[in-house]
């Protein structure tokens, strides 16, 4: 579960390395915590030099991995080792061209099909 002030890793090659959650936009209503598939507003805390995204820039991101266990529709429980997000634009398309690490199938149902197609492994 991601809440404001949570630090996240970036799971794409957009140029940012670490994010800090500022606000949970989510998918429905006024949510306090973000789960897999929810959209957040975040600030870049660490970035790769000479890239378009810079430190202290405010961006939108979608959560792709959380340390808190996540129960799938078929009953399988998935838990990751880190909290990670993919940086997106206003239309929901990823800013990077590659996605690192495993991604859950539920992102496809939430209309993040472009992120799922870039992922090397879908659980």
Curated annotation (Swiss-Prot):
Gene Ontology BP, a term: translation
SMART domains: Ribosomal_L14
UniProt keyword annotations, A-Z: Chloroplast, Plastid, Ribonucleoprotein, Ribosomal protein, RNA-binding, rRNA-binding
Gene Ontology cellular component list: chloroplast; cytosolic large ribosomal subunit
Keyword Nucleotide-binding on entry: no
Gene Ontology terms for molecular function: large ribosomal subunit rRNA binding; structural constituent of ribosome
Transmembrane segments: none
Compartment annotation: Plastid, Chloroplast
A Pfam family of this chain: Ribosomal_L14
Family matches, as PROSITE patterns: RIBOSOMAL_L14 (PS00049)
Domain of life assignment: Eukaryota
Function: Binds to 23S rRNA.
The protein's assembly and partners: Part of the 50S ribosomal subunit.
Family that this chain belongs to: Belongs to the universal ribosomal protein uL14 family.
Protein name: Large ribosomal subunit protein uL14c
Gene this chain is encoded by: rpl14
């Amino acid at each position: 579960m991601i809440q404001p002030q949570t630090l996240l890793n970036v799971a794409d090659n957009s140029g940012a390395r670490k994010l800090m959650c500022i606000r949970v936009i989510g998918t429905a209503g006024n949510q306090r915590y973000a789960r897999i598939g929810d959209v957040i507003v975040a600030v870049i805390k660490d970035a790769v030099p000479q890239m378009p995204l810079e430190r202290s820039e405010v961006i939108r991101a979608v959560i792709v991995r959380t340390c808190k266990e996540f129960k799938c529709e078929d009953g399988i429980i998935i838990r990751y080792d880190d909290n990670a997000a993919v940086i997106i634009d206003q239309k929901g398309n990823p800013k990077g061209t590659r996605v690192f690490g495993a991604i859950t199938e539920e992102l496809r149902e939430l209309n993040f099909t472009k992120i799922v197609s870039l992922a090397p492994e879908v659980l």
